Amino acid sequence: MNSDRIVTPKSETNFTLNNLNGFSYLEQLSPEQKDAVKCIDRSQIISAPAGSGKTRVLTYKIAYLIANGVKPSSILALTFTNKAANEMKSRVIELLDNNSINEIWMGTFHSIFLRILRNNSEYVSTKFKLNQHFLIYDQKAKNAVLELILEKYIKTYKEEKQKDNRKAAQDILLGISNIISRIKNEGKKVQECVSDESFDIRPYKKDQIINIYKDYRNKLQNSNAMDFDDILLYTFLMLSNNKEIAQKYQNLFEYILIDEYQDTNSIQFNIIDLIHRKNGKICAVGDDAQCIYSFRGSKIENIQKFSEKYSPTEYKLSINYRSTKEIVKVANKLILNNEHQSKRIETSKDEQNQLIENKIKIISSEDEKDEARKVIEKIIELRNKDIIENDWGSFAILYRTHKQAEPFEIQLKNMDIPYKIMGKISFLDNKIIVLIISYLRLLINEKDNISLQKIFSFSFNCISSKMKKIFDKADKSQEYYWNVINNLKPSKNDNTYILIKKFITFINSLKEQITMKEPIYFVEKIIEFIKSSFSFNEGDEDLISLFNNMAEFLTQKYHSNLRINDDDGSKENKSKDNFEGSDLILQNNFNEDIDPNKSLFVKYNIKEFLDDIILLNTNEDIIENINNFSGNEIIPNNSNKVKLMTIHSSKGLEFNSVFIVGVEEHLYPLSYYGMKDETEEKRKKHEEEERRMFYVAITRAKQNCFITYAHKRLTGKNVMIRKKSKFIGELENKYLDFSGDIINSNENFLQFKKSLLNNNWNNNFNSFYNYKSYSHNINYNKDKNKNESFPKKSNSYNFLNKKRYNPFK
C-alpha cells in the first residue's frame, strides 16, 4: 500500500468537522480504518468481516470526502436496508456541522433507483408505457396479480385451490414469484434465462414460465404499475439504452460507495457500472463470508468481478470490535472449510485483555420442546446474573426456518417473558392497512384493477360473488374495473348498486381535491368513509393509529427537507416563492399538529407518499423512522424483548447473547426440493452458502453464543431421529464447551438411536407432540405418559419472581 497516495485534508473547506468526545474525528479510527477512510483518489474494495466497523468506515469516508471539498450532491451511497441508510446518515450528521449533507444521494438501491426513474418519467412513459403516476406493487400486490394468472397455466395450482389446500397453492405461487424475480434480477430476456441450464425453473416447463412472465408483465403494464424488481430492471434498461441519461448520472456522481457489496446481484452490478464515470471512484465494502442471499440472486462472484473491472486498491479490516476471542476464533475456523473463500486473519479487540474464558456452549436436547425449555431457562439464568447488562432485548434466538419458532414462542408466552418475532407479519400486510393503501392507489390510478378488487373483496363482502363475476368478465374483455362499475345498471331493490354508487361518489369527491390537499387529508377521509360504511375488526383502531402516525411522520419529514437536489446537482427550492424561514417548513417538530386543510406552497402528493410507504418495507423500519425523526419513542420499539428471527433476518444485528437453535443435519445445511438430482458442484455451492449462514449466526453474538440441537424433531406428522450438524464438527474444539451435550460422538448417537428403536419410541411420542397451534391462548394436550414440559401460567417468570424462593434464581 502506497501511503503517499493517501490524500490529506485540504486546508480550505467550508465544512466544520466536529470533535467527538474531545478527539479529532480521525482519532476515533484504528490505523486500518483510517487508511481505508483517507484513500479517496482511486477506487477501492474494503474487506470488512463481521464486527470490524464497516459502517463507521463508510460514514467517516463520506465525512472525509465532504471535508476535502467534494460536493455532497456528487456522492452516491447505496445500502440494502433502510436501517443501514438511516444509521449512516445519523452518523454523518454527528461528524459534520453542515446542513448540506441532505444533498447526498444516500439510500437503498430501490429508493435511489426509483428516484432516478421518477426524475425521468418521460422516458419511462415512452419506453415502458407507464405514465408519471405509475404505482409500485409490493409482494402482496404482486401475489394478487399472479393469482389471476396461474390457474390458466399451472394445473396443480388450480387443483389445490379447488381442494382449498391453501398452503400448497401458496407454495406454488411463491415459487413462481421467486422465478420471476430471479429473471428480472438477471437483466436478461425471459427466453434467455429459461434456456440457460444453470437457471433453475423446476418443476415447471420453459413455455409455462415464459407465458406466465409475459402475462404478468402485461397485467402490471395495464395497471400502470411496476413491482420491486422492475425498479432495478427498468433503471438498467433505461441507462443501457439511453446514453444521454446515463451520461447525466455519470457526470453527477464523482464518488460511489456501496455497502454489503457481496449481496449485489447481476443487475445491480451492471447499473453501478452504467452510472460510474470513467475517472470516477467506487468504494465497495463487503465480506464474502456473509454472502447468504443467493435465493434473491446475489452473487459472491461480484466481488471478484469488481476487482477485475475497476482494479481497486484492497484494504482489509482485521479486528472484530463486537465479539469475544472465542467467538471470533470459532467463526474463522468454520469459514475456512469453504473452498471458494478468501483467507482471513481476524482477531478480537479483547484478545489480549480478555481474562475470563467464555467458550461457546453446545447443548443437546431430547426434542424441540426440551430444546426450547433449556434455551429459555438459560436466558432467565443469564438475565438474573445481571439484569442491567442483560435486559430481555439483549437475547436473540436464531433459527434456519420460521417453522422452528413455535416451541420457543409457546415457552416464552407461558413464562410471561416479553418477546418479538421479527419479520413474521408486516404492518403493511394487515387487512385494514392494505384497504387504506388501495383507496389511495385508486385515487391516482383508475387503471389499478388490483386495488379496486381488494377494496371490493375487503369492504363489500356481501356482494363479493356478484362482483367476482363482473370482474371476471372484465378480465376477459380487458376492461378496467373502474369503468365497469361506473357503467353498472341498477336493478329493483339493488342494495349492491346503492353501495357502489356511494363508493364512486366518494372517490370522485376526493379526486377533485388531489392537487389541493396532502396525503394525510385523504387518509383521514378514507378512514372516515370506511368507518361509516363498513364494520371494523378488533385491533383495527390501533393499526389505523399507527398508520396515521406514519402519515404524519412522512409529511413532516418531507416539509423539513424541502431544499433538495435536482438531477444536475444544483440546489432547487421547490416552493413557488422563496420563503426561507417560513413556518411552513416544519423543522423536525413531530409534536406540532399538522392541519390537513392548510394550504402549502409545496404539496406532498399521494404518489410520493405511496413510494415512501412501500420503501419502508418492514415494521422495524416504520417504527425506527418515526421514533428517530420525532426524537421521542412515539411508538414502542420492542427493544426490551427477546428477539426470535431467522438467520437471514439477523444480518447486520448484534446481541449480547445468541442462541442458534436446531443445528442439525437437514437444517444445517438445509435440504431442499430436487437437491439429490443436483450436480456435485451445485451441492457444494449450496453447502458453502449454508456454512456462511452459520458463520453469520455465530458472529451476531457479542458475549455469549449457544449452539443447540435436538435428537428428535417433529417433521410434518412424523417424529424423526436427528443428528447434529456436520458444521459443529468443523468448529475449533478448543473454544467449545460440550458439558451440555448429551451425545457428543457418532458412537453414542448410534447407541441412542438403537435404544429409541428398541423402546418403540415413535408410538410413545405421538401424543407428546400433539400440541395444537395457538393464537392468544395456549392450548395443547398433555401427554399422559410424561410430565408436562411447559410450566403452567401460574409458574411464569413474573409470578415466580415475586415468590420468596424462585427456582430460577
Question: What is the meaning of each model-derived region?
Answer:
Residues 107-115, 257-260, 285, 401-403, ...:
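Conserved helicase core region in the C-terminal RecA-like lobe
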